[in-house]
Amino acid sequence: MNNITGLNEKRNFLFNIVVPFFNCENYIKKCLDSILKQSYKNYQVHIVDDCSSDNSYEIAATICSNKENFRIIKNSRRMGALNNIYNSFSTLIEEPTKTIDLIIDGDDYLYSSDVLNFLKEKYTQSNCLITYGSHLSSKGIQGKKYPNFIRKYNLYRNYFWYASHLRTFRHDLWLSI
């Protein structure tokens, strides 16, 4: 990882968004609409249906039809979220140092139209390599910030339900694995 440097300068970069899902017909429209409503428009979306048995694929396909930056795949058999994410991030990226990978599950959504702008600022203001977010559940329960002692002693895995499902990281970090 010696070659990974920060995105300190203000520049446009690409969000490489992966939406893996299985049987999300009640949620996938809200998820994809939340991406379409983003004020920051430099993104591509890889939607991966993991062999759903409901109408999830049809709903997603209708939403992303005629959108050049959306690609949808339907697996013929269950592959699992990790496999779908790996395959999506293994596609050729022209400028990996200017690309941020983002994973959002098909039953989640971006709360605000400024989420991508917010993330862009976080990546350009520091040498940020990876982010995790907080969350607000449909019942109004908000995720918590990690207490200082958890951060100090790197105890993240011992404290569940603090971070959300929204995960982002630099694509060049992905390539260095």
Predicted regions and their residues:
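Nucleotide-sugar donor-binding/catalytic module of glycosyltransferases
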Residues: 1-177
